[in-house]
Amino acid sequence: MRYAHDECRRQGGKHVTFAPDTVHKLDLTGDGRDDYIVDLSETQCHDRPATYCGTAGCTFDIIVTLKRGGHRNVFSQRVLNHEILPGAGAKTIRFMLHGGYCGLSGGSPCSKTHRITARPFEFKQPK
């Protein structure tokens, strides 16, 4: 959440308004601990509407709770949309991404899936 305030200020915005569902608390790793999805798609940086969203989607973070305490941000990228797939244990998320992540043009979105663990991950565009 601090990122949202800092980025808004860096962009010349005055203040941030968070949507009620900006932070989702749920067990993503299957270990019984609360993990968090932070989705800034409905967050507003007043006077700077494109701060958190653009053609590649909106800022989206996954923060997991570690077994020995503390938290780790395992994913931080812009996504167009996401879907948590059904199933027991660690959750798999389908991410809708800018087409560039699949070698397509930006106007053609693509999907990638990832099973959530405590290991950080990111999607990279092909070279």
Per-region residue spans from a language model:
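Beta-propeller blade termini
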Residues: 15-30, 77-92
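Beta-propeller blade repeat segments, especially FG-GAP/WD-type strand-to-loop junctions
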Residues: 3-5, 47-74, 108, 113-120
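Acidic/hydrophobic-patterned starts of short beta strands in beta-sheet-rich repeat architectures
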Residues: 28-41, 88-98
